[in-house]
Amino acid sequence: MDYYQWRKKNRRRKRNLQTKKPLNYALKLLKYRVRFEDELRERLKKQGFADEEVESTINTLKKQGYLDDEKAAYLFALDEMRLKLFGPRVVRMKLKSLGVDEEIIERAIEKALEEIDFHEELKRLKGRFKDRWELRDYLYRRGFDPSLIEEILNKIDGGEE
C-alpha cells in the first residue's frame, strides 16, 4: 500500500468516526432544514444510537437553541400556507402527524395566519376558476374553514367592484 492509498483510507476512517457521534449526526440533519424534536429523536434511534445518547443530544441541542418545536412549527405552517396555499385545517393535520404538541400547533397557526395575506394570493388564483363555487370548493379541499372562505371571497369580490 503506497502513501496515497494509506492517506485516503485513514481519511475515510476518520470521517466515519466523526459521523458516528450522535451530536454530529443531528447537526448534519439540522443543516438541511429545521426539524421537530420527535422527528430528530426518531432519526437518531433509526441510526442506531442508544436512548441515553439520543436524549443527551436532544437536550444539548435545545440548550444551544438549535432545536425549538415552536419555531419549527411556525416556519412549517408559514411555508405550507404561503407557498402551498394550504389552509389551517390541513396544516394542523400535518403537524399532528409529525408529533407536535397541540398547544404549539395552535400558537403556530395563529401566528402564521396573522402574517399571511390570503387575499392577494387568492386574487391571482381566482382567474383559474369559472365561478365562485369552484374557488370555494378548491379552498375547502385545501383546508380552509367555511367562514374564512366566505370572508376572503367577499373581500375579493368587494375589491373588484
From Swiss-Prot:
The keyword Cytoplasm applies. Belongs to the RecX family. It comes from Thermotoga petrophila (strain ATCC BAA-488 / DSM 13995 / JCM 10881 / RKU-1). Keywords: Cytoplasm. Its main location: cytoplasm. Modulates RecA activity. GO terms for cellular component: cytoplasm. The keyword Isomerase does not apply. This is Regulatory protein RecX.
